[in-house]
Amino acid sequence: MPEPKLHKIERIVVRGTNWVGDAVMTVPALRNLRRLFPNSHITLATRSLAKDLFSEAEFLDDLLVHEGGGLRSVVHQVRDWRRRNFDLAVLLPNSIETALVASLARVPIRIGYATDGRQRLLTHPLDLPDWRSSQHEVFYYLNIIARLEWLVNREQTFLNTQPDASLEVAETRKIAALDFLRHNRIKGITDGRLLIAICPGSINSRAKRWPAERYAALADRFIDECGADILLIGSAAEEAVSLEVSERMRNNPVMLTGKTELAELVAVLSLVDLLVTNDTGPAHIAAALGRPTLVIFGPTNPLTTRPFSPLAEIVRSAPDCAPCMLRECPIDHRCMTAIQPDEVFERARIMLGRRKMADERPFSACPQTQPLPEFNNKLEFIEQIK
């Protein structure tokens, strides 16, 4: 029999993940939670770093922002959660802190993975799935909601249907982004030239960065051969990397690194024809927005963390030592240095040639030198990464 308490859930809190890319990968789980509890009030507790991703999410009712760590943060969160009288806590991160907050806040039903010694703090602890290292992270988060589905309805459909990882940007924000780009003298938004964003940094891992001189060579080629406008994007912490790329270029890119809040960056990415990036948060954002996204992978595992979209492709050399998951390479960074600008440009050229995969806005794509290969449809893509 289904658990009766779960049919009376009125107020739900979801403890979100801490990094932007991870937050995007939780979207299918959040969307299916709304399907499971269509009339409940759902609050997402998240850090300010990720809150702007969800400000317009139709599957959420409220955002609860928290910062910092340690005892003070725990006390603050416990007070906030108690005041809101949540009936159910869905804990997406694996930390003991998140389970401690839910337990001390006296949330009656607490579900999450039984990791980090927190099993006794959860009312519904889940074992880690044995497939975690071989399936996409989207399914790791979705598995928690699938367990809830079983407890409520005695059926599991969420893991057998195509997850929806898409995000939308309101027209008003797109218009504001257009004005922002005009202010930065981006002509391509009005005359049909390609608008290509490049994210050469990575906040939490130097090993994930493709060399700056190669990004510079790639960007120059986009400008010389495709007539593209180039946007260098990233957070303030990545400004030095973007400056190095800019200084190594013959042409002039537009430096947006460190000049946009996440909400502005999301809106700008919704307008680009292509994003070329390392394995970073913007890769997941652009793909979720339905923009063609080319990700250069090195030490991380694309099987589990590539952007969850058929519009996202990867370039990878895959030496024997990859994926090592290290943040600093102890040897010669061969997973990244083996990838040449010509290889990335050719893949990008093919992606840009698929006009049907982008918006109908006309642009002058790079010249095609060979027929375009067929692209897998969305269902086939999902089967490849499950």
Go through the PLM ranges and name each one.
Residues 1-386:
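Catalytic machinery of carbohydrate-active enzymes
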